[in-house]
Amino acid sequence: MGTARFLRAVLLLSVLLMVTFPALLSAEHHDGRVDICRLPSDSGDCLRFFEMWYFDGTTCTKFVYGGYGGNDNRFPTEKACVKRCAKA
């Protein structure tokens, strides 16, 4: 019983790492800095309701932020998102 639960946890963690790690790697600059504009949208851990903006790789898109956690691809206005992430 305990072994099956442990193996399920290891499998779940492995899948989570396979999904998350490549996204984080693709967001890195060659010097190791993370390009926040390449991070996926992340609504965070709380259940509050804040309309925010993130860059989806092409345009700035509105999303709901929960108020805590998430990542830095989060802007209070479309203008701030465009200024930081849109390439001329």
From Swiss-Prot:
Positions of the propeptide removed during maturation: 28-33
InterPro entries named among the record's database cross-references: Kunitz_BPTI (IPR002223), Kunitz_BPTI_sf (IPR036880), Serpin_venom_toxin (IPR051388)
Keyword Protein transport recorded: no
Disulfide bond among keywords: yes
Cysteine disulfide links: C37-C85, C60-C81
Signal peptide residue numbers: 1-27
Record GO terms (molecular function): potassium channel regulator activity; serine-type endopeptidase inhibitor activity; toxin activity
Location, primary (coarse class): secreted
Tissue specificity of this protein: Expressed by the venom gland.
Record GO cellular component, one term: extracellular region
Database matches in CDD domains: Kunitz_huwentoxin (cd22598)
Marked site: May bind Kv1: L39
Pfam families to which the protein is assigned, alphabetical: Kunitz_BPTI
Site (Reactive bond for chymotrypsin): L47, R48
Localization: Secreted
Domain BPTI/Kunitz inhibitor: 37-85
Biological process per Gene Ontology, one example term: envenomation resulting in negative regulation of voltage-gated potassium channel activity in another organism
UniProt keyword list: Disulfide bond, Protease inhibitor, Secreted, Serine protease inhibitor, Signal
SMART domains, A to Z: KU
Protein function: Serine protease inhibitor that inhibits trypsin at a molar ratio of 1:1.
Family statement drawn from the similarity comment of this UniProt entry: Belongs to the venom Kunitz-type family. 03 (sub-Kunitz) subfamily.
Protein name per the record: U15-Kunitz-type theraphotoxin-Hhn1b
Organism: Cyriopagopus hainanus
